[in-house]
From Swiss-Prot:
HAMAP family: Ribosomal_uL3_B. GO terms for cellular component: cytosolic large ribosomal subunit. Gene3D superfamilies: 3.30.160.810, Translation factors (2.40.30.10). This is Large ribosomal subunit protein uL3. Belongs to the universal ribosomal protein uL3 family. The gene is rplC. The keyword Flavoprotein does not apply. The modification N5-methylglutamine is found at Q150. It comes from Sodalis glossinidius (strain morsitans). Part of the 50S ribosomal subunit. Forms a cluster with proteins L14 and L19. Residues 133-152 are annotated as: Disordered. Keywords: Methylation, Ribonucleoprotein, Ribosomal protein, RNA-binding, rRNA-binding. PANTHER family: 50S RIBOSOMAL PROTEIN L3, LARGE RIBOSOMAL SUBUNIT PROTEIN UL3C. Methylated by PrmB.
Length: 209
């Protein structure tokens, strides 16, 4: 199996035996419950669908309620999919815990970054500001020229300009696993992960480990 769903609890630090301080992010990984198993015959690929956490009964729509009831699991806060390797046997209703990462050294963590709203080029792309004085009165933080002339006669796609910053899917790769606490369903990784406290995270063994 490729990963688990967790929730960002926050950041703290722990100390090694040598007294070195390590900044860590605490990720709570409650048991992921398998709601569906997909196979080559019916779906064209092998994967499992999981849910995590809980959702109030009055917030569960009827199609979701039926789906969870069919799987025989408690309604969770969402549905996610992970590919599975050939030979891996996973059954509907099975619970998968943070113990999955017991022997993993590095992980990739995916989340939704904090939204910053509409941002200018200085904040969004680290553009330099223009002169504060020397005749410049209104163009201190503007991007400047965005193109050439009649040739090519257009602004190229991908041009860095002002716009929405943040609130997008981001993956941080190869974070060191500092501790796996099976009793408390916690995973401690070195460094920061995307998103706000309480946000959902997808944690997978690192592809570049």
């Amino acid at each position: 199996m490729k990963g688990l769903i967790g929730r960002k609890v926050g950041m703290t630090r722990i100390f090694t035996e040598d007294g070195v301080s390590i900044p860590v992010t605490v990720i709570e990984i409650e048991a992921n419950r398998v709601t569906q198993v997909k196979d080559l015959e019916n779906d064209g690929y092998r994967a499992i669908q999981v849910t995590a956490g809980t959702k109030k009964a009055n917030r569960v729509i009827k199609p979701e309620a039926g789906h969870f009831a069919k799987a025989g699991v408690e309604a969770g806060r969402g549905l996610w999919e992970f590919r599975v390797e050939d030979g891996e046997e996973v059954t509907v209703g099975q619970s998968i815990t943070v113990e999955l990462f017991a022997d993993v050294k590095k992980v990739d963590v995916t989340g939704t970054s904090k939204g910053k709203g509409f941002a200018g080029t200085v904040k969004r792309w680290n553009f330099r500001t223009q002169d504060a004085t020397h005749g410049n009165s209104l163009s201190h933080r503007v991007p400047g020229s965005i193109g050439q002339n009649q040739t090519p006669g257009k602004v190229f796609k991908g041009k860095k300009m002002a716009g929405q910053l943040g609130n997008e899917r981001v993956t941080v790769q190869s974070l060191d696993v500092v501790r796996v606490d099976v009793e408390r369903n916690l995973l401690l990784v070195k460094g920061a992960v995307p998103g706000a406290t309480g946000g959902d995270l997808i944690v997978k063994p690192a592809v570049k480990a």
